C-alpha cells in the first residue's frame, strides 16, 4: 500500500518488537515509523528501532506519551515530531499522575532539563490509583 499511495504511510504504534519494525523496513511498508517506548519494551528498544530507522533514512515520530518521548526525539537525528494529545477524559491516566505536564507553545515542546525523563510525579494522585 505504501508504494501505491502518494503520501507517506506511518505505522508502528502498536508494534511490540524490533522484529516487527525490521519487517516494516524490509518490506518498505511505511515511510515513517511510530515506535512507542511503552509498548516496545522501554527506552533501549525504542532507541534501537530509531537508530535502525535512521540507517535506512526513515524518520521516527513516536506514538503518544509526549512526556516520555520528548527526550528520546531529542536524542536521535531522525525524529520528525512528537505526538501530543490533550488530556482525554476516561481514556488515559498517565497525565493524571504528573504534577507538571508538558504544554506546547507555538507548536513546540521544550525538552525539560530535569534529571532522567524530567517527569514530576504527583504522589497524591498516584495514591488515588493504589490498589490495596
Locate the predicted segments by residue.
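Shared catalytic-loop signature of beta/alpha-barrel
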Residues: 1-108
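C-terminal extensions of enzymes
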Residues: 92-132
Amino acid at each position: 500500500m505504501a508504494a501505491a499511495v502518494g503520501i507517506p504511510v506511518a505505522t508502528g504504534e502498536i508494534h511490540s518488537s524490533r522484529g516487527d519494525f525490521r519487517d516494516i523496513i524490509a518490506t518498505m511498508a511505511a515511510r515513517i515509523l511510530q515506535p512507542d517506548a511503552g509498548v516496545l519494551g522501554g527506552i533501549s528498544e525504542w532507541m534501537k528501532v530509531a537508530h535502525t530507522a535512521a540507517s535506512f533514512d526513515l524518520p521516527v515520530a513516536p506514538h503518544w506519551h509526549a512526556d516520555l518521548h520528548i527526550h528520546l526525539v531529542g536524542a536521535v537525528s531522525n525524529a520528525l515530531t512528537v505526538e501530543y494529545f490533550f488530556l482525554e477524559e476516561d481514556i488515559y491516566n498517565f497525565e493524571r499522575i504528573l504534577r507538571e505536564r508538558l504544554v506546547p507553545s507555538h507548536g513546540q515542546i521544550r525538552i525539560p532539563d530535569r534529571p532522567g525523563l524530567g517527569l514530576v510525579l504527583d504522589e497524591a494522585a498516584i495514591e488515588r490509583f493504589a490498589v490495596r
